[in-house]
């Protein structure tokens, strides 16, 4: 009788040990599954956060580009151009592809239009008494600007060596683009006229390169009218 009781007790203890082992295994599996699920969720959240960060960085650049894609120059223009370029340079290649605004796109800074160093903005002082101001609409394509606009200016300088040839663009949008992207500063009409006055120019000949009589041609003449009392034009 005592031997049978011992056998029953041993069997019960063995069963309990097996159940404990099964429960421990189940608990470990559940814990492993929960940890795996948490890791997956964290990875997904990190991926979403990374995508959002990329989009925000690209949108910031797009907003900065749109802010300088304007026809009016202000006291903040130089700083805005510098800020837009710095923000663009800080983007990754993938982020640059996401830049999209009202006017902004990856080509604003990313497109290769030629070597800007081959151009001459002709915005130097020491003009002298006689100035020949070449006024163009302008272009942000570096190779074209160096070949066409600079070509005209160089030809005029060669033909009139006693006159100082200077440049002005009527499209502030283009001036801002070239300045922001290439660091080349080109005078607008007001800057060019103020430069002439500051340099004591007495005789100013204005040579437009516009192909037609449009709004910016009229704006050029309106600007010249403001300086008639200061310079012989």
Put a short name on every predicted segment.
Residues 1-10:
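Bacterial Sec-dependent N-terminal signal peptides
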Residues 14-21:
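Bacterial N-terminal signal peptides
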Residues 24-25:
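C-terminal motif of bacterial Sec signal peptides marking the signal peptidase cleavage site
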Residues 31-56, 108-122:
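N-terminal, intrinsically disordered, polar/charged segments of Gram-positive cell-envelope systems
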Residues 48-110:
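Beta-rich interaction/scaffold domains
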Residues 163-181:
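Short connector loops at secondary-structure junctions
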Residues 182-195:
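Glycine-rich, highly charged phosphate/nucleotide-binding loops
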Residues 231-233:
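Conserved small/polar residues in nucleotide/adenosyl-binding loops
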């Amino acid at each position: 009788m005592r031997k049978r009781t011992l056998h029953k007790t041993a069997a019960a203890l063995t069963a309990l040990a097996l159940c404990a082992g099964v429960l421990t295994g189940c608990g470990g599996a559940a814990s492993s599954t929960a940890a795996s699920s948490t890791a997956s969720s964290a990875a997904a959240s990190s991926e979403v956060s990374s995508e959002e960060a990329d989009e925000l960085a690209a949108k910031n650049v797009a907003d900065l580009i749109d802010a300088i894609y304007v026809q009016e120059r202000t006291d903040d223009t130089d700083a805005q151009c510098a800020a837009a370029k710095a923000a663009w340079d800080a983007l990754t290649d993938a982020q640059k592809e996401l830049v999209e605004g009202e006017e902004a796109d990856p080509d604003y800074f990313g497109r290769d239009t030629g070597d800007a160093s081959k151009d001459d903005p002709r915005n130097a002082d020491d003009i002298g008494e006689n100035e020949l101001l070449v006024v163009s609409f302008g272009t942000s394509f570096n190779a074209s600007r160096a070949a066409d606009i600079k070509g005209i200016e160089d030809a005029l300088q060669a033909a009139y060596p006693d006159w100082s040839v200077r440049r002005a663009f009527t499209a502030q949008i283009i001036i801002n683009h070239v300045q922001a992207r290439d660091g080349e500063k080109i005078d607008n009409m007001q800057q060019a006229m103020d430069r002439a006055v500051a340099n004591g120019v007495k005789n100013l000949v204005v040579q437009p390169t516009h192909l037609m009589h449009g709004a910016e041609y009229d704006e050029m003449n309106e600007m010249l009218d403001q300086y008639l009392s200061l310079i012989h034009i």
